Amino acid sequence: MAEATNQVAVANGHENEDNNDHLIQSSDPQHPANLIPEMCRKFYTWGWVTGTGGGTSIRHGDHIFIAPSGVQKELIQPENMFVMQFPTPKYPPSERKYIRKPKNLKPSDCTPLFLTAFERGAGCCIHTHSQWAVLVTLLVEREYGKEGYFEISNIEQIKGIPKGKGKGMHNYHDTLRIPIIENTPFEEDLTEGLERAINANPDTYAVLVRRHGIYVWGDTPAKAKTQCESLDWLFQLAVEMHKLGLPWDINKTK
């Protein structure tokens, strides 16, 4: 375990004198450099970021903090954070404005997808490889085809998901609809599909990726986290309901 920890907690690079290390040094537990590692540790215990998968990013003023790619998420430390200037170009990658890069770590493959959420006003974006998210994408495809949405109604927990910017939260009787996009061989190639899904569903705060996972965002880290929790609970419930032959969306059966 010590060797694995060292793999993640490597020394920072020094392309300039201090590599802007002051950006990730804070005693405040809510500072993004401290909060992202704490969130990733929780997500690991929930099975959301197993095997280095998934990621988390927080926008803090005109800075974006991003966990590195290809590392064990439960071992991430504040010094492992990448920091970008915001706004910043999504493409080409060489034009992205990194103002802090830890040595020997790779920028997240999720970066352009996180930027897509931030361009729409999000304060935090979470990407998980939840098994429940993957399963509901497969069930929707089998029952409704590749154009189908995940839809569920008359379940108390949908009240934890916003209806859209400034529109309040879903009510118990509402139908929650989450769009699903197709997976791609490389994470960054999901960006176009994510953008299309958001443009077609401007009120959504989440997009499922078939056979892959989900992207969830919120106005703040706390809102993104609780929305992701609510959705994952609903996905697990939906899988169990399907086993029992119970409909997800009662509004469709009326």
Curated annotation (Swiss-Prot):
<dbReference type="GO" id="GO:0008270">
    <property type="term" value="F:zinc ion binding"/>
</dbReference>
<dbReference type="GO" id="GO:0046570">
    <property type="term" value="F:methylthioribulose 1-phosphate dehydratase activity"/>
</dbReference>
<keyword id="KW-0963">Cytoplasm</keyword>
<feature type="binding site">
    <location>
        <position position="129"/>
    </location>
    <ligand>
        <name>Zn(2+)</name>
    </ligand>
</feature>
<feature type="binding site">
    <location>
        <position position="212"/>
    </location>
    <ligand>
        <name>Zn(2+)</name>
    </ligand>
</feature>
<comment type="function">
    <text>Catalyzes the dehydration of methylthioribulose-1-phosphate (MTRu-1-P) into 2,3-diketo-5-methylthiopentyl-1-phosphate (DK-MTP-1-P).</text>
</comment>
<feature type="active site" description="Proton donor/acceptor">
    <location>
        <position position="156"/>
    </location>
</feature>
<protein>
    <recommendedName>
        <fullName>Methylthioribulose-1-phosphate dehydratase</fullName>
        <ecNumber>4.2.1.109</ecNumber>
    </recommendedName>
</protein>
<keyword id="KW-0862">Zinc</keyword>
<keyword id="KW-0479">Metal-binding</keyword>
<dbReference type="InterPro" id="IPR027514">
    <property type="entry name" value="Salvage_MtnB_euk"/>
</dbReference>
<dbReference type="InterPro" id="IPR036409">
    <property type="entry name" value="Aldolase_II/adducin_N_sf"/>
</dbReference>
<dbReference type="Pfam" id="PF00596">
    <property type="entry name" value="Aldolase_II"/>
</dbReference>
<feature type="binding site">
    <location>
        <position position="127"/>
    </location>
    <ligand>
        <name>Zn(2+)</name>
    </ligand>
</feature>
<comment type="similarity">
    <text>Belongs to the aldolase class II family. MtnB subfamily.</text>
</comment>
<dbReference type="GO" id="GO:0019509">
    <property type="term" value="P:L-methionine salvage from methylthioadenosine"/>
</dbReference>
<keyword id="KW-0028">Amino-acid biosynthesis</keyword>
<keyword id="KW-0456">Lyase</keyword>
<feature type="binding site">
    <location>
        <position position="110"/>
    </location>
    <ligand>
        <name>substrate</name>
    </ligand>
</feature>
<dbReference type="InterPro" id="IPR017714">
    <property type="entry name" value="MethylthioRu-1-P_deHdtase_MtnB"/>
</dbReference>
<comment type="pathway">
    <text>Amino-acid biosynthesis; L-methionine biosynthesis via salvage pathway; L-methionine from S-methyl-5-thio-alpha-D-ribose 1-phosphate: step 2/6.</text>
</comment>
<keyword id="KW-0486">Methionine biosynthesis</keyword>
<dbReference type="GO" id="GO:0005737">
    <property type="term" value="C:cytoplasm"/>
</dbReference>
<dbReference type="InterPro" id="IPR001303">
    <property type="entry name" value="Aldolase_II/adducin_N"/>
</dbReference>
